[in-house]
């Protein structure tokens, strides 16, 4: 039996190991035994805490979303203006925690497997909606709501695209360059230049 009080630590170790294992393999075609080995625990203990691979994978995704949400909330609390809020949202998405190679690979793997998993698809939609709504909240203080929605859609697509480029490796922008690209895009859109509809 696991030691009393060790469950939170062991669960976190297994989730971290799942991120590494999925990231290294670039696939969800991993076993609980492989993840447990990476975490340095027995497969039986992993099954005890999560009840199987699917639940461990979903717990890993939820952990990444919680971590992103926690970091974002902390950053937004320090923002005093809409521009600072936008900068905080962008910076958190490219922070050292989020823009790490194995985390990026895990996220992209989740996107691929969302085509077969309704649970994964639902969690990815939650992420996309949160990013969009956070951006729109700040942007609509600077422009119309319709334009704020359009800019937020573009910024979200850029963030996803930069993650893909970083995963591919070739000529991938670093975090600072990625932040600058998204900030430049938003600044240009807010500058009053005509949109494609005009």
Swiss-Prot record:
Pfam families recorded: TetR_C_6, TetR_N
InterPro entries xref list: BetI_C (IPR039538), DNA-bd_HTH_TetR-type_CS (IPR023772), Homeodomain-like_sf (IPR009057), HTH-type_TetR-like_transc_reg (IPR050109), HTH_TetR (IPR001647), Tet_transcr_reg_TetR-rel_C_sf (IPR036271), Tscrpt_rep_BetI (IPR017757)
Name assigned to this protein: HTH-type transcriptional regulator BetI
Membrane-spanning residues: none
Residues in the DNA-binding region annotation: 31-50
Signal peptide extent: none
Described function: Repressor involved in the biosynthesis of the osmoprotectant glycine betaine. It represses transcription of the choline transporter BetT and the genes of BetAB involved in the synthesis of glycine betaine.
Domain HTH tetR-type stretches: 8-68
Keywords: DNA-binding, Repressor, Transcription, Transcription regulation
Annotated metabolic or biological route of this protein: Amine and polyamine biosynthesis; betaine biosynthesis via choline pathway [regulation]
MF (Gene Ontology): DNA-binding transcription factor activity; transcription cis-regulatory region binding
GO biological process, one term: glycine betaine biosynthetic process from choline
């Amino acid at each position: 039996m696991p030691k009393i009080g060790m469950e939170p630590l062991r669960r976190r170790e297994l989730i971290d190991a799942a991120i590494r294992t999925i990231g290294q393999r670039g696939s969800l075609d991993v076993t609980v035994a492989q993840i447990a080995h990476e975490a340095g625990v027995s497969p039986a203990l992993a099954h005890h805490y999560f009840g199987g691979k699917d639940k461990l994978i979903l717990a890993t995704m939820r952990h990444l979303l919680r971590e992103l949400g926690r970091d974002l909330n902390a950053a937004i609390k320090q923002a005093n203006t809409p521009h600072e809020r936008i900068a905080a949202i962008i910076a958190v998405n490219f922070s050292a925690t989020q823009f790490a190679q194995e985390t990026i690979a895990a996220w992209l793997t989740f996107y691929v497997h969302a085509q077969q998993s309704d649970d994964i698809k639902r969690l990815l939609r939650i992420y996309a909606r949160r990013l969009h709504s956070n951006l729109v909240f700040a942007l609509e203080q600077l422009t119309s709501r319709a334009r704020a929605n359009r800019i937020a859609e573009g910024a979200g697509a850029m963030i996803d695209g930069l993650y893909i480029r970083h995963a591919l490796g070739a000529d991938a922008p670093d975090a600072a360059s990625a932040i600058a690209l998204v900030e430049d895009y938003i600044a240009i859109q807010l500058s009053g230049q005509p949109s494609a509809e005009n």
